[in-house]
Amino acid sequence: MKTILVITDGIGYSDKTQYNAFYHAKKPTYDYLFKNVPYGMIDTFGLSVGLPQGQMGNSEVGHMCIGSGRVLYQDLVRISRAIEYDEIKDNPALVEVTQQSAVVHLCGLLSDGGVHSHIVHLKALAQILSTQGKRVYLHLITDGRDVLPKSALNYLADIESICEDNVSIASVSGRFYAMDRDKRWDRVQKAYESIALGKNPTNLSPKEYIQSQYDEGIFDEFLTPVSFGGFQGMNDDESFVFVNFRSDRAREIVDCLGNPQFKEFKRERYVKLHIATMTEYDATFPYPILFPKQNVQNTLAEVISSHRLKQFHTAETEKYAHVTFFLNGGREEAFIGEERVLIPSPNVKTYDLQPQMNASAVGDAVIKAVEQGYDFVVVNFANGDMVGHTGNLEAAIKAVEAVDKELGRIVESAQKHHYALFITSDHGNCEEMKDEKGNMLTNHTVGQVWCFGMIEGVSKIENGGLNNIAPSVLKAMNLPIPPEMDKPLF
């Protein structure tokens, strides 16, 4: 049976209702699904997706798990284990790059959110290199998105506990500047200039500087890039390690630091660094990688392609990599018979300004693909997550309503054209917009999501994990489930 898989990013279950955008939204399609379509509850966090116990899930991990049909131990766990077992100091890429210079620059997101980085990794590398007699400069990127919006001072105190004679903080940038992924080079340039060139110097201590930004109403995500302590910038032949393990928001800043042919903005000077990256950020990057990606065979898309069936993958810009690269097990190029359609995300500063985003155009692409008879259609609706990240409850309610409207069209189209339909989420977000004290929550939730299965002759969907989605799709399509995959939900 031809099948549609809808991933409603950031829409999850919570029994708390007061600040629950899903609960408060007018959602006739979901009301219909709850009454008429079997569903199970799906785990999206912690060990169920290869993350540490209790760690919130995220879009990268979720889509890898959905598409591979198995639990892959994620980079966060792999790196943490290498630190725990004292193996990272002998990592070939780390040794290769850091032995080139007595000076090592470490750059990464300063939080324990575990989505892009972990402060434990940054601290461990700094301590190892310091013990080896290296002069270590820290370039800290403040978070405020995967963790509380004003939590940087806590993480600063933690990292300052390891700062000593040869470990010091050289720069601080909010992730809005240093971790863009949409080619907003004016932002990236500001971060680059503080990190590489020591521009925008301040005489304040890092703690005083962050507090001064708070006093101006500027919180962690948006801290203006600065340099500290007389840091004059990097010099040729120094070593640089970027410690984030998630690729999408690391590419741009690393590209402008390391690419001699970089042309997106005019660099005052190009510093020739010895660069290593924690994971593979881009297949075209020439830098040594501490933790190269694990090769994942027999993913959902690969199995469908191997049976010479046509498949269609679509999402907005913000989640396009998730329904292509991540869903396909970390593979850049499309499989034979796989078509990809990118719908541009709206060009707004934050998505609460346009909570519907471009959902209607994404819905149009799905309807068209169904009418064209694709054997498998997968789509991601970004609204619940991207608007959930803004912390704006009213906007998040509108985001859910926009997704619900498109789901209604897809349900109708699936029924009309005799498609099986799965609707699930990679993780939650918008169902908890504030905590009990009314503090804004911008992070993903630690909880379950629904998986609805509208399949001819199927009246029960079991509870399970994201790893059970791909085998369920293959079963609905009457295709063999490869031995690497886990069991289906029906």
Curated annotation (Swiss-Prot):
What is this protein for, i.e. what is its function? Answer: Catalyzes the interconversion of 2-phosphoglycerate and 3-phosphoglycerate.
Gene Ontology terms, MF aspect: manganese ion binding; phosphoglycerate mutase activity
Q: Which top-level group of life is the source organism from? A: Bacteria
InterPro entries named in the record: Alkaline_phosphatase_core_sf, BPG-indep_PGM_N, Metalloenzyme, PGAM_B_sf, Pgm_bpd_ind
- At which positions is Mn(2+) 2 bound? D9, S59, D426, H427
The similarity comment for this entry is: Belongs to the BPG-independent phosphoglycerate mutase family.
Co-factor requirement: Mn(2+)
Q: What is this protein called?
A: 2,3-bisphosphoglycerate-independent phosphoglycerate mutase
Q: What is its EC number?
A: 5.4.2.12
Q: Does the keyword GTP-binding apply?
A: no
Metabolic or biological pathway = Carbohydrate degradation; glycolysis; pyruvate from D-glyceraldehyde 3-phosphate: step 3/5
Catalytic activity of the protein: (2R)-2-phosphoglycerate = (2R)-3-phosphoglycerate
Identify the taxonomic lineage of the organism of origin: Bacteria, Pseudomonadati, Campylobacterota, Epsilonproteobacteria, Campylobacterales
> What GO terms fall under cellular component here?
cytosol
For whether the record's keyword set contains Metal-binding, the answer is yes
Which residues are responsible for catalysis? S59 (phosphoserine intermediate)
